[in-house]
Amino acid sequence: MTDLKKAAQRAIELMDLTTLNDDDTDQKVIDLCHKAKTPAGNTAAICIYPRFIPIARKTLDEIGAEDIQIATVTNFPHGNDDIAIAVLETRAAVAYGADEVDVVFPYRALMEGNETVGFELVKACKEACGEVLLKVIIESGVLADPALIRRASELSIDAGADFIKTSTGKVPVNATLEAAEIMLTVISEKNTQVGFKPAGGVRDAAQAAEFLGVAERILGADWVSPRTFRFGASSLLNSLLHTLELADAPKPTQGY
C-alpha cells in the first residue's frame, strides 16, 4: 500500500463524517449513516445537529454500525458568550444521546479581551457532559492571530476540554496547518491526553497526510488514534475512497 493510500485509510478511521446544513433532513442523516459504513471500514463518528441523534442512533443500530460514535454541536456556529444557553444546549444534546459534543468557544469575546467567559463556558459544558466527550471549537480561522489561537487552546484545555477543534466549517478560513501546529504544540505542553480535530478544508489524502504529519512530529507516531485525533469533514470521504480505488473521482465541491 502506498503512503497516500495508508494516509487515506487512516483518515477514514479518524473521521467525523459531518452534515451540519440548514436543509438537513432525517433522510440526509440516514444516508450519512450508511456512508459512514464505508468499504474501507467505519468512520470514527458522524457529526449532526442534535435533533437528528435519535434517527441516527436507530439507523446505525439497524446497519450494524453501533461502534460509530454520534457527535453533535452546541453553541453553534457563532460561539456566543451566554454560558447558561450553551449549558442548556449541551445538556439537551446529552439527553438526546450524543456520545460526543462539539461546543463553540466564545471566540469573539476572547478577541475583545475577555478570557474568563471562555474558560467558564467550557468548564460548565464539561460538567454538563459527564462522561460524554467534549470537543471545543476555537474558530482558529477567525481568531487568526497565533497568540489568540494559542490562548483559546490553553483556556479550553485548562477548563477540561477532551479535544480542541479548529473550526465550525461555517467561516471562510477553516483548518490550516499553521493553526494545527499551534494547537498541537499547546497539547504537547499542557496535556497529551487531549485530542485535536482539524475541521473543514481538508480535501484529499495528501492534505490529510500533512495534518497527520504535523501531529506525529509534535506528539509522536503512537499518539494519533481516534481517541486523540479526528478529521471533521463531509466531502473528504469520497476523495479518500477514490484514493483507495473504492469510489469514482469526487465531483468538485464547496462543502465542508
Swiss-Prot record:
Q: What class of enzyme is it?
A: lyase
What is catalysed by this protein?
2-deoxy-D-ribose 5-phosphate = D-glyceraldehyde 3-phosphate + acetaldehyde
Q: Can you supply one Gene Ontology CC term for this chain's record? A: cytoplasm
Q: Where are the coiled-coil regions? A: none
Subcellular location(s): the record lists:
Cytoplasm
Superkingdom of the source? Answer: Bacteria
Gene Ontology MF, one: deoxyribose-phosphate aldolase activity
> What InterPro entries does this protein's entry cite?
Aldolase_TIM, DeoC, DeoC/FbaB/LacD_aldolase, DeoC_typeII
Q: What is its EC number?
A: 4.1.2.4
HAMAP family (UniProt xref): DeoC_type2
Q: State the protein's name.
A: Deoxyribose-phosphate aldolase
The organism named in the record is Shewanella sp. (strain W3-18-1)
Q: What gene codes for this chain?
A: deoC
